[in-house]
A protein has these predicted regions:
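N-terminal Rossmann-like FAD-binding beta1-loop-alpha1 element of flavoenzymes
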Residues: 141-165
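Ferredoxin-type iron-sulfur electron-transfer modules and their immediate structural context
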Residues: 1-145
Length: 165
């Protein structure tokens, strides 16, 4: 899984934030672009844990070690597929999730944890940029209407299939 010594070879590095005075004037991304080689290095930091506590710390049970490995290897399209295997809305969770997975990261016991949230966001951004992620509206319309009352984001994922009817 990944680079065997990646967690020793690379330090945690986050994409820099845009200046606040610039951000208050627009709705653009908070973080600046991050070069692919740095993203791959962050994916390489993921250790081959016997028990991936990051995965159990994730509310949607993302296959975090798997897609971190795919990032390290530069296999972005497969990473998109792997991410969507457990998460209907990675474009949201990669931005607004408080990332309990990072708090559960085994590397975090002795060093700063893997940049899981940043990696997730960049997988989904790459998927949209490359055209691998596209809307999938239903080809058959019944004419019926569905109302979904959501108390919070946690209820969106199980109801997402209803939105394609």
């Amino acid at each position: 899984m990944g680079k065997t010594t990646g967690f020793m070879d690379y330090s945690r590095e986050m994409a820099p934030r845009r200046p606040v005075l610039e951000r208050v004037n627009d709705w653009f991304e908070i973080y600046q672009d991050f070069p692919e080689e740095k993203l791959r290095a962050q994916g390489a930091r993921c250790m081959d844990c016997g028990v991936p506590f990051c995965q159990t710390g994730c509310p949607v049970s993302n296959l975090i070690p798997d897609w971190n490995d795919l990032i390290y290897r530069g296999r972005w399209k497969e990473a998109v597929r792997q991410l969507h295997a457990t998460n209907n809305f990675p474009e949201f969770t990669g931005r607004i999730c408080p990332a309990p997975c990072e708090a559960s990261c085994v590397l975090g016991i002795t060093a700063p944890p893997v940049t899981i949230k940043q990696n997730e966001k960049n997988i989904v951004e790459r998927g949209f940029l490359e055209g691998w992620i596209r809307p999938e509206p239903s080809k058959l319309r019944t004419g019926k209407k569905t109302a979904i009352l959501l108390r919070n984001n946690i209820w969106m994922a199980p109801n997402a299939p209803l939105l394609t009817c």
